[in-house]
Amino acid sequence: IPEASKLVIDALADCQGGEIFVLKMKAFVLGQLAEAFRNVLSTGADFKVETRGIIGAEKMHEELVSSEEAKRLWETENHYVIEPIGGNWSPEKSMSKAKIEHFNSMDAEKFEGTELQAFINNYISSLNIQ
C-alpha cells in the first residue's frame, strides 16, 4: 500500500497526460501469500490452507507491460512509464529508456523465503493497530 500510494504521488508530479505508470513490484504466488498470512496471523490455533486448484477464468500471471508497450517504455528507480501514442510527450530527466521486452508477474523479481511475511508485518506495524 505505501508503494502504491507513492506511485500515485509520483504520477501526479510527473504526468503530462496519457502516459501509464506501472509500479516495479515483486511478485508472489497465491500460496506464498496464504502461507505468509498464516504465519503472521496464526496465534497457535489450527490455521488450515486449502488448495483447490485453478478455477475458470483465473490468470496464472499478470501482464503489466506488453511487448508492444515496451517499445515506448521509460523507467525510474521505482516505476515504469508507458509513453502515450502521439502527442508532445517527453520523458522527465529522472527517466531512462527501459531495456525490457515486457513486464509480467512470471518474469518479475519474486519475494523469497520469509520476505513476503516481513513485508506484511512491516505494513501491519505501520498501521499502529493494537
Model-derived features: positions:
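Strand-loop microenvironment adjacent to phosphate/nucleotide-handling motifs in alpha/beta enzyme folds
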Residues: 1-130
